[in-house]
Amino acid sequence: MKSSMAATGLVAAAVVGLAVATSPTAAAADLVGPGCADYAAANPSGPASVEGMSQVPVAVAASNNPMLTTLTSAVSGRLNPQVNLVDTLNNGQYTVFAPTDPAFDKLPASTIVQLKTDSNL
């Protein structure tokens, strides 16, 4: 329960930057968020591509995306060892509104410090 609450607070704390598609039929033409077309053009193939991310579980897809390193750290236990959602995210079908690294950069440094120590967020 603490892990779920931490993820909810974490995701709500930042602006939606890039939606990670988890459908095998995902295509760059289906992207709707600001910056998504530029991301798809910059990552046309491989594990960080829209197609590549659509073929793997959510936590794996996020870890393959170079714009989601802070989110990946937050949900994998690297930011706060008491919060590890990898198994949960990888064993279900989820839509994740994934704040990008620039979104996390807009948070006060004290918030990131609190996320590192307070698993109830």
From Swiss-Prot:
It comes from Mycobacterium kansasii. Its main location: secreted. Keywords: Secreted, Signal. InterPro entries: FAS1_dom_sf, FAS1_domain. Residues 55-121 form the FAS1 domain. This is Immunogenic protein MPT70 analog. Pfam families: Fasciclin. Residues 1-28 form the signal peptide. It is found in: Secreted. It comes from the Bacteria. Gene3D superfamilies: FAS1 domain. The keyword Oxidoreductase does not apply. GO terms for cellular component: extracellular region.
